[in-house]
Amino acid sequence: MSARIVVTGTDTGIGKTVFAAALAGALDATYWKPVQSGLEDETDSGAVQRLSGLAADRILPERYRLRTPASPHLAAEIDGVDIDVAALELPSVSRPLVVEGAGGLMVPLTRETTYIDVFARWAAPLVLCARTSLGTINHTLLSIEAIRARDIPLLGVAFLGDENLDSEQIIVELGHTRRLGRLPRLERLDAAALRAAFAAAFEPRDFLGDAP
């Protein structure tokens, strides 16, 4: 079976989609966003296709497309959509699969189920994206604790933003996990610049093995 990698984050708006695009491009993978909330601006799937350089057929259609830009549980209620979390199964594809969640681990899909509940059922290796700015130590260590409490395999932490060596070091030490690399902020964000930045900061094979 090809590698299946879940990309999640400590919070929303930290650059998780940009990282997912870089990872999918580096692995020549297929990308899937199960639930998209908000359709007026560019969707995450659209951004990943634009930034990854992948062909359109490598971007799988979302299982749910919700018009309202809100947490999926609320967006679904406003839009009159019932999200069947039991039907959210990882697609079977012939190459690596990068799956992106929404916001953080505890974002609700319904009034009863959060993303981390689905991740635990999938039991696929997970990459935790974390910002490097003030407050990241607490948010990231809490996220790692939640992941470990559910026996989800954690590949490591991908840091996003400006260099903050002490915060990055204390997170991997106290979290007993790997620092996969750090994707810096890019003045010019396009497919070529993102590909170069990812290649300089990450080793693709770190994402293809079993979680340590």
Swiss-Prot record:
Q: Which domain of life is it from?
A: Bacteria
Record-listed substrate binding positions: S37
Instruction: Name the keywords, alphabetized.
Output: ATP-binding, Biotin biosynthesis, Cytoplasm, Ligase, Magnesium, Metal-binding, Nucleotide-binding
Under the subunit heading, UniProt states:
Homodimer.
| Record-listed Mg(2+) binding positions | T17, E100
Pathway in which this enzyme or protein is active: Cofactor biosynthesis; biotin biosynthesis; biotin from 7,8-diaminononanoate: step 1/2
GO MF annotation list: ATP binding; dethiobiotin synthase activity; magnesium ion binding
Q: Which family does it belong to?
A: Belongs to the dethiobiotin synthetase family.
Q: Is-annotated flag, keyword Metal-binding?
A: yes
Q: Indicate what this protein is called per its UniProt record.
A: ATP-dependent dethiobiotin synthetase BioD
Q: Which GO terms describe its biological process?
A: biotin biosynthetic process
Catalytic activity entry: (7R,8S)-7,8-diammoniononanoate + CO2 + ATP = (4R,5S)-dethiobiotin + ADP + phosphate + 3 H(+)
UniProt cross-references to Pfam families, sorted A to Z: AAA_26 (PF13500)
The entry's function note states:
Catalyzes a mechanistically unusual reaction, the ATP-dependent insertion of CO2 between the N7 and N8 nitrogen atoms of 7,8-diaminopelargonic acid (DAPA, also called 7,8-diammoniononanoate) to form a ureido ring.
Which cofactors are required for activity?
Mg(2+)
What subcellular locations does the record give?
Answer: Cytoplasm
List the active-site residues.
Answer: K33
What Enzyme Commission number(s) appear in the record? 6.3.3.3
Chief localization class?
cytoplasm
Q: Which InterPro entries match?
A: DTB_synth_BioD (IPR004472), P-loop_NTPase (IPR027417)
Q: Which Gene3D superfamilies match?
A: P-loop containing nucleotide triphosphate hydrolases (3.40.50.300)
Positions contributing to ATP binding: G13, I14, G15, K16, T17, V18, E100, G101, A102, G103, P184, R185, L186
Question: Would you tell me the Gene Ontology cellular component terms?
Answer: cytosol
